[in-house]
Amino acid sequence: MEQWTTEIWFSISIAFLIGTLCGVLVMRFFKGNIQQQIQLKSELASAEAKIEEQKQQLERHFEQSANLLENLAEDYKKLYTHFAQNSEQLLPESNQVEFFKRLKNHANGDEDNQPRDYSDGSSGLLKS
């Protein structure tokens, strides 16, 4: 290989300095975009974290609601069983039969008469 002269070394160093200067200028020109990208990434990460937190809150809400409804169903079942057992113990059988007969007769009385779509007297503008 031939010996490189000082002129070649000088032109190589000038080209390196010009390239470095161009690189610095390009970086300064596009630096705003890089900062904007970094800001957008941080906003995206915070939005994703917020969505994940909301999902977890929603899951906890539904889990707690399911547990409360299950407890409510169990308590209602206990209440119904309590009333059923106490009504059998507290009401004599003859009273139970009479009580249910009265309820049945009362319900049957309503079924004998059909509902009417008119009133007994006149009403509205044509009252006499």
Curated annotation (Swiss-Prot):
<dbReference type="GO" id="GO:0051301">
    <property type="term" value="P:cell division"/>
</dbReference>
<keyword id="KW-0132">Cell division</keyword>
<keyword id="KW-1003">Cell membrane</keyword>
<keyword id="KW-0812">Transmembrane</keyword>
<dbReference type="Pfam" id="PF01724">
    <property type="entry name" value="DUF29"/>
</dbReference>
<keyword id="KW-0133">Cell shape</keyword>
<dbReference type="GO" id="GO:0005886">
    <property type="term" value="C:plasma membrane"/>
</dbReference>
<keyword id="KW-0175">Coiled coil</keyword>
<comment type="subunit">
    <text>Homotetramer. In solution, is primarily monomeric but forms small amounts of stable tetramer and hexadecamer. The crystal structure of the cytosolic region shows a coiled-coil tetramer in the asymmetric unit that is very likely to be a physiologically relevant assembly of the protein.</text>
</comment>
<dbReference type="GO" id="GO:0008360">
    <property type="term" value="P:regulation of cell shape"/>
</dbReference>
<keyword id="KW-0131">Cell cycle</keyword>
<protein>
    <recommendedName>
        <fullName>Z-ring associated protein G</fullName>
    </recommendedName>
</protein>
<feature type="transmembrane region" description="Helical">
    <location>
        <begin position="7"/>
        <end position="27"/>
    </location>
</feature>
<comment type="function">
    <text>Involved in cell division, cell envelope biogenesis and cell shape maintenance.</text>
</comment>
<feature type="region of interest" description="Disordered">
    <location>
        <begin position="105"/>
        <end position="128"/>
    </location>
</feature>
<keyword id="KW-0472">Membrane</keyword>
<comment type="similarity">
    <text>Belongs to the ZapG family.</text>
</comment>
<keyword id="KW-0997">Cell inner membrane</keyword>
<dbReference type="InterPro" id="IPR009386">
    <property type="entry name" value="ZapG-like"/>
</dbReference>
<feature type="coiled-coil region">
    <location>
        <begin position="37"/>
        <end position="75"/>
    </location>
</feature>
<dbReference type="Pfam" id="PF06295">
    <property type="entry name" value="ZapG-like"/>
</dbReference>
<keyword id="KW-1133">Transmembrane helix</keyword>
<feature type="compositionally biased region" description="Basic and acidic residues">
    <location>
        <begin position="107"/>
        <end position="119"/>
    </location>
</feature>
